């Protein structure tokens, strides 16, 4: 809802791919944003990263602040030649990795820790994996082979699970 407060959980924060944060926010395991909206926000994110430039650092600033400013400037320089299409590809590949990991985590929480409430979120996460595989299968033959296996073998098993429900594909890049 428009007036609800959201919480960003950063307890597992680690250094990772530049597109991990946008994947986590825009392809959340509990809510789905339309692909067009995701890409609009992703383009804005890339634009802001690319425009970081050189922040002004005063003599009063501590060494960590100056170091962070230097990192931001370096990041902006590294992103100068990254196209929106390339950044989107990184986003989709990072999303594939993240959501495959989440499928495993949610299964573990159910099987080992007896926390079955996460099973309700598996259909959305499965759909994210399928979408990412459809979008990135041309990136490498191993991704295409994995997609074929996932669709033919794993989806046959997934469809038989009590938690599985088909999600409407309208608005998905499938």
Model-identified regions with their sequence ranges:
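Active-site acidic catalytic loop and adjacent metal/ATP-binding pocket
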Residues: 1-22, 32
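Active-site activation/catalytic loop segments of kinase-like enzymes and analogous catalytic loops
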Residues: 18-59, 67, 71, 93-113, ...
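Amphipathic alpha-helical interaction segments
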Residues: 40, 76, 86-90, 124, ...
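ATP/Mg2+ or Mg2+-diphosphate-binding catalytic cores
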Residues: 104-174
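C-terminal structural cap/anchor segments
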Residues: 52, 79-95
